[in-house]
């Protein structure tokens, strides 16, 4: 018999599931091409689950359900809350774009987005290999369908096919690695796997063999080198509203899954996976920044930017354990979580501008499409400038403190190799600043092209959300301590559960 606590653990997921099905049914009777009722119900659902998750997080308790297959803890609850808010913002930005391209027909855009979020929730709360994998597959299958939503668009169809083939390969890697760990430890439960490895009664070679495949699968979901090949093509080929769905909230779910597997499950193997993360971080910083410099397509540039940002995120993850010492675990993983949250917030603002500048029959995807944006809309230009400055890591924007937190975690480790990595990361950030500042130069100093001279029109709700989104980049940069503390305390709950 399933106890009451188990049902409490999955209340938000049940609400999300029921509402996604209900919205699909309601949409059958909606005739409006802009799907106003479906849109309102989607926002209501996302707001409700965000409030539920925030209440769980503020409770500060950690408890398990369904035979330890699901965990509710502050880290997971906050990440699910922020994922819901991120998707809510995405839906607000994406609705005008999707309506102009007949993507709201049938209501699949909203329904698939909610089911993708359900998969993210399962990824974040899963404490069992099979549960994590099921959540991952639910999210990715919905993502494949969303990328291919414009069936008459050859570029989107090509992107969906690439995403599907490479995604299936990465899922196979991850599943094979998990099966190796199951064979070695005899358990699918993350806590039991941790205890089995810590007991040193399992062959190290078998564990490392499985670990390689797991890290490969996780790197694909994060978009880290050398498993980044899908990212630029999918970002560029997918409809921009879908690009933001893929590049926003799923990054938080991928971060949570990485913490669940590598920290909660495989922390005794830290010295092994840290070496892999270090190589991937270096590759991501180099390839991401150098490739972004050569791009003229804004979405493709932001895709390579994402790869470089994931390099910074990986640096935070590898700084948590130093020679088996977990003294800096909380600060390092807290800095990584803070980095993930601020990256998603900044990405939402940047892609929000691209979405709101697009109009029927025209995609504002080229950097030159932003020419003279300040003359047409100082608000849009200001938000985009803050996004670029934040991604570049310049004060007083929140991206500066995100990068600073990761660098402090590396330096405080006291390891020469980590200090070298910190210096290298700063150097690559200087290269990255070039292509971010190029966007600002185009907006403020170039004359608008003739096809960009039309006045910008966007729904009031989207403009309000955009203004708040941009303001948060500045406010959290001026006063980042509250969010930093929240991240550190969330990670502390994970560390305490491990007894390290």
From Swiss-Prot:
Membrane protein topology class: Multi-pass membrane protein
Highest rank taxon of the organism: Bacteria
TM stretches of this protein: 6-26, 40-60, 69-89, 106-125, 129-151, 164-184, 207-227, 239-259, 276-296, 302-322, 337-357, 380-400, 417-437, 464-484
Chief subcellular location: membrane
The protein's enzyme class: translocase
Pfam family membership, one: Proton_antipo_M
GO molecular function: NADH dehydrogenase (ubiquinone) activity; NADH:ubiquinone reductase (non-electrogenic) activity; quinone binding
GO CC aspect terms: plasma membrane
EC number: 7.1.1.-
Coiled coil (UniProt feature): none
Keywords of this entry: Cell inner membrane, Cell membrane, Membrane, NAD, Quinone, Translocase, Transmembrane, Transmembrane helix, Transport, Ubiquinone
Subcellular location(s) per record: Cell inner membrane
Catalysed conversion reaction: a quinone + NADH + 5 H(+)(in) = a quinol + NAD(+) + 4 H(+)(out)
GO process annotations (BP): ATP synthesis coupled electron transport
Family the entry assigns: Belongs to the complex I subunit 2 family.
Subunit structure: NDH-1 is composed of 14 different subunits. Subunits NuoA, H, J, K, L, M, N constitute the membrane sector of the complex.
Stored HAMAP family: NDH1_NuoN_1
Record-given protein name: NADH-quinone oxidoreductase subunit N
Organism: Polaromonas naphthalenivorans (strain CJ2)
């Amino acid at each position: 018999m399933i106890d009451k606590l188990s049902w409490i653990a999955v209340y938000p997921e049940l609400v999300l599931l029921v509402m996604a099905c209900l919205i699909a049914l309601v949409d059958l009777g909606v005739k409006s091409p802009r799907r106003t009722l479906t849109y309102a119900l989607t926002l209501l659902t996302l707001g409700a689950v965000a409030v539920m998750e925030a209440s769980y997080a503020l409770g500060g308790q950690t408890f398990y359900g369904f035979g330890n297959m699901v965990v509710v803890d502050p880290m997971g609850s906050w990440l699910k809350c922020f994922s819901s808010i991120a998707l809510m913002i995405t839906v607000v930005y994406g609705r005008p774009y999707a309506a102009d391209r007949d993507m709201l027909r049938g209501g699949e855009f909203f329904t698939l987005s909610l089911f993708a979020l359900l998969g993210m929730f399962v990824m974040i709360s899963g404490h069992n290999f099979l549960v994590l994998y099921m959540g991952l597959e639910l999210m990715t299958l919905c993502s494949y369908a969303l990328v291919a939503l414009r069936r008459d668009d050859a570029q989107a169809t090509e992107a969906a096919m690439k995403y599907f083939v490479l995604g299936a390969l990465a899922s196979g890697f991850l599943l094979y690695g998990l099966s190796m760990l199951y064979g070695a430890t005899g358990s699918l439960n993350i806590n039991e796997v941790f205890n089995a490895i810590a007991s040193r009664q399992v062959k190290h070679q078998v564990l490392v063999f499985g670990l390689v495949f797991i890290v490969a699968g996780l790197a694909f979901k994060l978009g880290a080198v050398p498993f980044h090949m899908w990212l630029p093509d999918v970002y560029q080929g997918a409809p921009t509203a879908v690009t933001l769905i893929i590049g926003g909230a799923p990054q938080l779910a991928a971060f949570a899954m990485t913490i669940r597997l590598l920290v909660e499950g495989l922390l005794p193997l830290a010295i092994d996976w840290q070496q892999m993360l270090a190589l991937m971080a270096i590759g991501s910083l180099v390839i991401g920044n150098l490739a972004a410099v050569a791009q003229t397509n804004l979405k493709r540039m932001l895709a390579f930017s994402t790869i470089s940002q994931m390099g910074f995120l990986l640096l935070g993850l590898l700084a948590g354990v130093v020679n088996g010492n977990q003294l800096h675990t909380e600060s390092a993983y807290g800095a990584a979580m803070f980095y993930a949250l601020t990256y998603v917030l900044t990405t939402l603002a940047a892609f929000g501008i691209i979405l709101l500048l697009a109009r029927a029959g025209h995609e504002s995807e080229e950097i030159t499409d932003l020419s003279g944006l300040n003359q047409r809309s100082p608000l849009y230009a200001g938000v985009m400038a803050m996004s670029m400055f934040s991604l570049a890591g310049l004060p007083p924007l929140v991206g500066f403190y995100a990068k600073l937190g990761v660098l402090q975690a590396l330096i405080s480790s006291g390891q020469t190799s980590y200090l070298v990595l910190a210096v290298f990361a700063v150097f690559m950030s200087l290269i990255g600043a070039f292509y971010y500042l190029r966007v600002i130069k185009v907006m403020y100093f170039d004359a608008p092209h003739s096809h960009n001279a039309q006045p910008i029109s966007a729904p009031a709700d989207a403009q309000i959300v955009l203004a708040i989104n941009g303001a948060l980049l500045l406010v959290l940069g001026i006063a980042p301590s509250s969010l930093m503390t929240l991240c550190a305390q969330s990670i502390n709950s994970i560390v305490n559960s491990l007894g390290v």
